[in-house]
Amino acid sequence: MLFSSLVFLFTFLPITLLVYYLVPRKVKNVVLLIASLIFYAWGEPVYIFLMLISILFNYFCGMDIALKAGRKSQVRSLIFTIVVNLFILGFFKYYGFIVTNLNAILPFYIPYRKLELPIGISFYTFQTLSYIIDVYRGNVDVQVNLIDFGTYVTMFPQLIAGPIVQYADVERQLRERKESLTKFGYGAWFFVMGLAKKVLLANTIGSIYENIAAMDGMSVVTAWLGCLAYTFQIYFDFSGYSDMAVGLGKMFGFEFMQNFNYPYISKSVTEFWRRWHISLGSWFREYVYIPLGGNRVTVPRHLLNLLIVWFLTGLWHGASWNFVVWGLFYGVILITEKYFTGKILAKLPEAVQILYTMILVMLGWVLFFSPTLGSAFTWIGNMFGQGATGFMDSQALYLIMRNWLFWVAGIIGSTPFMHLLGKRLVFDEERPHTVLAGCLMTGLFVLCVAYLVTESYNPFLYFRF
C-alpha cells in the first residue's frame, strides 16, 4: 500500500486516525501496531510473519543483552543478535546475487530460486540493529513492553521507506508523546506537500525518463535530459515520501527527523551527502564509521574506513555490482575532496561548485538506474558523445519544448524557494494562517487525487531497497 494510493488516502488513513483519536491513551500504541501490521500485510501478506519473528527475536535478545550488562557473555549475545539480523537481511536481499556470481566462476552450477525482497526489510532491520546496539552501549533502556517495541519496529509512517528512526530518538515518544491540533495541522501540511512532490512532480518527470530510457538511440542532449529527469524523479519521489512520513508522524504525535535538506544546492559531494538521505548517513556514521575509528586514525586507516562505509552504503541499496560501484564511486570522491580538492573547490564561484557537484551526482545516478554496468557505461558514453546519434536532434528539442514547465518546476522545487515562499505566505511567527493553509492544501490534494484517478503511472523507487 502506497501513501499515494487512493485506498490509503480515503480508507486506511481516515479509519486509522479516527480509531487512534477515539481510544484512550494506554491503547493508542495497540491501534498503531495493528494498523501498521495491516498496512504491511496489504502488500506483503506472507512476509508479515518474517516481521513478527524479527520483532519477537529482537525483543527477547534486547532483554537478554540488558540482563547480561557488564558480563563477557553480553558481547556474545550482541554478536549473535547482529549476525542473525544481518543473515536474514542478507539471505533475502543478497542470496541470488551471491549465487549468480559464484555460478559465473565455479565449474559447476548452484541451483537457486529467486526470492522476492520483503518490502522495507533494509529499513526495519537497521532500526532493530540501532535498538540492540544502543541497549548494549547503555544509551537507552531496554524496552520491556512488547507492544511498544512492536510499534517502534512496524510504525507504518516510516516502515517501508524511512526515515530510519533510531530508537533513542523515539524512546520517550513511544510513551509520552502529545498530540495537538497544531501539530496535526503541521503534519497535514507536510503530508500534502510530500504527496504533491511525489504525484505531481516525481511521477510526471519520471514518465519523461521512462520514455527516454526506452529509446534505441539518443543524442548527447537527450542522454543528459534523461539523466536530469531521473535526477529530479528520485529526489521528488524519495523526499516526497519522506515528507509524507514526517507529516504522518506528526499526525500521530511523533517527531521524526527530516531526511532531506535540498541536496541539489550542495557545493560539494561531501555536502550533498550531508543533505541526502540524512537518516541513512547518520546510521552508518553512528554504527559503522565511528566504531571503525572514524577520522581519529592514521590516514591509510581513514581511507579504508571511508571505503568500507561507502561499499556498505552501495550494497545496502541493492544486490548488484552497479550499487557496489556506485557506493565506491562516492567513497573515492569524498576521499578526493577530503585530502586533495576540497580547499581548491571552496575557492571557486558558488555556481561552479554547484555545477561540479551536480555533474558528479548525475553521473552517479546513471550507475544507480541502469540495470547493468555495461548499460550504465553506454549511457555515460552517450552523454559525452561516444555512441550518441549526434549532439542535438529533433527528439531532444521536442523533449525540451514539450516539457519545459516540468524542467523549470524541477529546478525550482529542488531549491528552498517554494518552502520559503510557503512559509512567508502561510506561517507567521510559527503560527499558520489557517484559512490560506487549508485552501492551498485542499487545492494541491485535489490535483493529486485527480492525477491518481486518471493516471496509472505511480511507482515508488525506494520500494526495491
Language-model region placement:
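Membrane-embedded transmembrane alpha-helical bundles that form the catalytic cores
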Residues: 1-464
